[in-house]
Amino acid sequence: MALFSAQSPYINPIIPFTGPIQGGLQEGLQVTLQGTTKSFAQRFVVNFQNSFNGNDIAFHFNPRFEEGGYVVCNTKQNGQWGPEERKMQMPFQKGMPFELCFLVQRSEFKVMVNKKFFVQYQHRVPYHLVDTIAVSGCLKLSFITFQNSAAPVQHVFSTLQFSQPVQFPRTPKGRKQKTQNFRPAHQAPMAQTTIHMVHSTPGQMFSTPGIPPVVYPTPAYTIPFYTPIPNGLYPSKSIMISGNVLPDATRFHINLRCGGDIAFHLNPRFNENAVVRNTQINNSWGQEERSLLGRMPFSRGQSFSVWIICEGHCFKVAVNGQHMCEYYHRLKNLQDINTLEVAGDIQLTHVQT
């Protein structure tokens, strides 16, 4: 059984962060946080709670770096804390990236850190009362995602939940684009890599049979990276890619492929301070598009999140929660666009198709 998006993720949320969980917690819901602890970190907190006021917290997850490092788990009801459960082990490191996953099960939360089981916490209050997640402390988050094994596939794209709202303005028609000859960097034959759709490699996120994880753990990605897009693209389909640009990066690219053709080529080039978009049909590149509404959104040595939304007439692209561009379809049969390729001077941390 595959996991499906229960709601759109929060991208680069500002800490402290509090946000709603659409529909509340449900059995089978997996909540994944990816971020980095600060080098001076003492502690941070993830709360699953009822409403924004914090008086009722079903699950308080609190890593503390003092005293050798340990993690406190607890529940607060009507403003009163219950007995603490302490795990005298610290799975996080100061100043280092992490992936933290919570799986809601009938009788407990299961917690994974960097794809390894860490702790389980028995429910003290009904989990369906939880409708809010709150994160605070000495950390920086790249995203919070929500995946549900019981949810049907959503073919209608819901409102984006970037921590800062994304605006997708219409692109003025009739704009002329500059034409240049271009060969993409880091080409690799697709037959060299076979990856099953958004399933963890290697290892297993949770021991629950029949529920494979959707989010790759950080070490599982290799560049170039390929994965199929099940059933191809369709209007409202979205793809999210997060990662880190290497400090000495020259370029990288994201390709949406249709067999041997490339329907959408997104190619940040740092030496040119440009983001090139193009289509390749029968090994021939079309006219490049380079214009941007603002400045170059990618930086060497910095993390990024790219959100690509397929609409009926175009792709809409947001970077770090901000609209970057639209790209009108040149290959019209969207369903045949069924492979994602990422390559170049980056480290991948998250892919969601």
UniProtKB/Swiss-Prot annotation:
Give induction info.
By viral mimic polyinosinic:polycytidylic acid (poly I:C) and lipopolysaccharides (LPS) in microglia. Up-regulated in macrophages following infection with Mycobacterium tuberculosis.
Q: Which GO terms describe its cellular component?
A: collagen-containing extracellular matrix; cytoplasm; extracellular region; nucleus; plasma membrane
Domain-level remarks: Contains two homologous but distinct carbohydrate-binding domains.
Official protein name in the record: Galectin-9
Q: Which domain of life is it from?
A: Eukaryota
Pfam families in the record: Gal-bind_lectin
The UniProt subunit note reads as follows: Homodimer.
Q: Where in the cell is it found?
A: Cytoplasm; Nucleus; Secreted
Phenotype upon gene inactivation: Increased natural killer (NK) cell activity with enhanced degranulation, higher expression of NK cell activating receptors, increased frequency of intermediate and mature NK cells, and greater production of interferon-gamma following murine cytomegalovirus infection. Defective iTreg cell differentiation with impaired Foxp3 expression, reduced stability and suppressor function of iTreg cells and reduced frequency of iTreg cells but not natural regulatory T (nTreg) cells in lamina propria.
GO terms of molecular function: carbohydrate binding; enzyme binding; galactoside binding; protein serine/threonine kinase activator activity; signaling receptor binding
- Role description: Binds galactosides. Has high affinity for the Forssman pentasaccharide. Ligand for HAVCR2/TIM3. Binding to HAVCR2 induces T-helper type 1 lymphocyte (Th1) death. Also stimulates bactericidal activity in infected macrophages by causing macrophage activation and IL1B secretion which restricts intracellular bacterial growth. Ligand for P4HB; the interaction retains P4HB at the cell surface of Th2 T-helper cells, increasing disulfide reductase activity at the plasma membrane, altering the plasma membrane redox state and enhancing cell migration.
Chain sites annotated for binding a beta-D-galactoside 1: N47, H60, R64, N74, W81, G82, P83, E84, E85, R86, K87
* UniProt gene name: Lgals9
User: Which tissues is this protein detected in according to the database?
Assistant: Accentuated expression in liver and thymus of embryo, detected in embryonic heart, brain, lung, liver, and kidney. Highly expressed in adult thymus, small intestine, and liver, and to a lesser extent in lung, kidney, spleen, cardiac, and skeletal muscle. Barely detectable in brain and reticulocyte. Expressed in placenta, uterus and decidua during pregnancy. Expressed in CD4+ T-cells with higher levels in iTreg cells than other T-cell types and sustained high levels throughout iTreg cell differentiation (at protein level). Expressed in myeloid cells in lung.
Residue ranges of domain Galectin in the record: 17-147, 225-353
